[in-house]
From Swiss-Prot:
Record organism: Rattus norvegicus (Rat)
Protein's membrane topology: Lipid-anchor
GO cellular component: brush border; clathrin-coated vesicle; cytoplasm; cytosol; dendritic shaft; dendritic spine; glutamatergic synapse; Golgi membrane
Major localisation: membrane
Subunit structure and binding partners: Interacts with GIPC PDZ domain. Interacts with GNAO1.
GO biological process, one term: chemical synaptic transmission
Pfam family, one: RGS
Functional note: Inhibits signal transduction by increasing the GTPase activity of G protein alpha subunits thereby driving them into their inactive GDP-bound form. Binds to G-alpha subfamily 1 members, predominantly to G(i)-alpha-3. Activity on G(z)-alpha is inhibited by phosphorylation and palmitoylation of the G-protein.
Gene Ontology terms for molecular function: actin binding; G-protein alpha-subunit binding; GTPase activator activity; identical protein binding; myosin binding
Protein name (Swiss-Prot/TrEMBL): Regulator of G-protein signaling 19
Organism lineage: Eukaryota, Metazoa, Chordata, Craniata, Vertebrata
Region (Disordered): 1-30
RGS domain boundaries: 90-206
Cellular localization per UniProt: Membrane
Length: 216
């Protein structure tokens, strides 16, 4: 017959067998947070930094795709003699001709006033936009590039027009810069256009289209 001590051991044995084995100091789960990435401020920053970088790259690609710089030449085909002669009839005919705008823009570059044509073209492009987000972004860039007094390409606008633009920029539309565009158009018409008609650039185009005299 087992003694009371042996009976107690037999009673407690199965319970101890069912217990999970105790973990050693090597198997114990770490009590602190996961190890930090040395390049981040906290253990979760690594994913956050990577996500922010991807978002920044996507925004930059989107911005560049929407706002490509204007080409240095609208068309590359030479104008006909009749077209060249029509540019002297009126400034409107010059500006309605893609080739005429390209030639006139090259002339403005020699006078260090190309920004006037660039601004006018940017306003024309803005008028074709219907997407609200694109309009907002392009209007902001036009303002920064040609209206802001901090821009090296600032165009000459009077205070009344500037104040009107500042009000309209609170809610931009495709016609935010209409008054400013008209003012720059008038400036080019009265100031640069007469000099263009007497410039070597225009005269050479007229001579190229003139009929050559034949000798008998």
């Amino acid at each position: 017959m087992p003694t009371p001590h042996e009976a107690e051991k037999q009673h407690t044995g199965p319970e101890e067998a069912d217990r999970p084995p105790s973990m050693s100091s090597h198997d114990a789960a770490p009590s602190g947070p996961p190890s930090r990435n040395p390049c981040c401020l906290c253990w979760c920053c690594c994913c956050s930094c990577s996500w922010n970088q991807e978002r920044q790259r996507a925004w930059q690609v989107s911005r560049e795709s929407k706002l490509q710089p204007l080409p240095s030449c609208e068309v590359c085909t030479p104008p006909s003699p009749e077209e060249v002669q029509s540019w002297a009839q009126s400034f409107d005919k010059l500006m309605h001709s893609p080739t005429g705008r390209s030639v006139f823009r090259a002339f403005l570059r020699t006078e260090y006033s190309e920004e006037n044509m660039l601004f006018w073209l940017a306003c024309e492009e803005l008028k074709t936009e219907a997407d609200r987000h694109v309009v907002d972004e392009k209007a902001r860039l036009i303002y920064e590039d040609y209206v802001s007094i901090l821009s090296p390409k600032e165009v000459s606008l009077d205070s009344r027009v500037r104040e009107g633009i500042n009000r309209k920029m609170q809610e931009p539309s495709p016609h935010t810069f209409d008054d400013a565009q008209l003012q720059i158009y008038t400036l080019m018409h009265r100031d640069s256009y007469p000099r263009f008609l007497t410039s070597p650039t225009y005269r050479s185009l007229l001579l190229q289209g003139a009929p050559q005299s034949s000798e008998a």
